[in-house]
Amino acid sequence: MHRQSVARLTRQCHGLPLVELPPPYLAPSLHFSLIRTPVQCSSFSSTAVVAGRGRDLNKTRGVSAIHRTGPRFKLGVSKYPLPKPVSPAALEKREATPNHGLWGFFPRDRSALSTPEYDIAHGRSWSIQELREKSWEDLHCLWWVCVKERNRIATSNLERQRLKAGYGEWEARERDRTIRITQNGIKHVLRERWYAWEDAKRLYKKGYRPQDEENQE
């Protein structure tokens, strides 16, 4: 057995003679580290000491709408009395606005749901050649007429889904497809005008003038 181990065992056994020491083959099991790790005596906690339990300063502690527990003292709603609801018989009748802008999101008969006969009664879409002859103001007005009509179709489709009517989907989809073709044509015409303006600006920067050709003729 190593001398340091024998000396350490002798000190730990309070000076017992060598006869009472364990045999040498048990020395590895009785080997202790020279530096002992400190043993923690208190339980682990991530809370600071100054943040220990004290007086609860939360006045709404325990207030729960689920368990129907209210505050510890009564609270007033307001310093003014609550208004009392008016009975329907005493309400003042208001006249409807016949020309309100929101009526544009409903059919002409102002019903909440458009009928298949109403949705299928429409013409064809505008062709690109017809749209080329329109002015900027006409194209602008036609675009927003298409937008309002598509919003009306979307409103009817939402109401149809809510009521689970089971009819009118095909007619509304065909009407919406026709309107989208017109909108795509308006975009195409505006794109052509934009390219034409870009080409004219490029030619002007290069020095081209239409009146020069007229003078040569």
UniProtKB/Swiss-Prot annotation:
A GO biological-process term: mitochondrial translation
Main location: mitochondrion
Keyword annotations: Mitochondrion, Ribonucleoprotein, Ribosomal protein, Transit peptide
Compartment(s): Mitochondrion
Cellular component GO terms, alphabetical: mitochondrial large ribosomal subunit
Molecular function as annotated in GO: structural constituent of ribosome
Subunit: Component of the mitochondrial large ribosomal subunit. Mature mitochondrial ribosomes consist of a small (37S) and a large (54S) subunit. The 37S subunit contains at least 33 different proteins and 1 molecule of RNA (15S). The 54S subunit contains at least 45 different proteins and 1 molecule of RNA (21S).
Family to which this protein belongs: Belongs to the universal ribosomal protein uL29 family.
Name of protein: Large ribosomal subunit protein uL29m
Organism: Aspergillus fumigatus (strain ATCC MYA-4609 / CBS 101355 / FGSC A1100 / Af293)
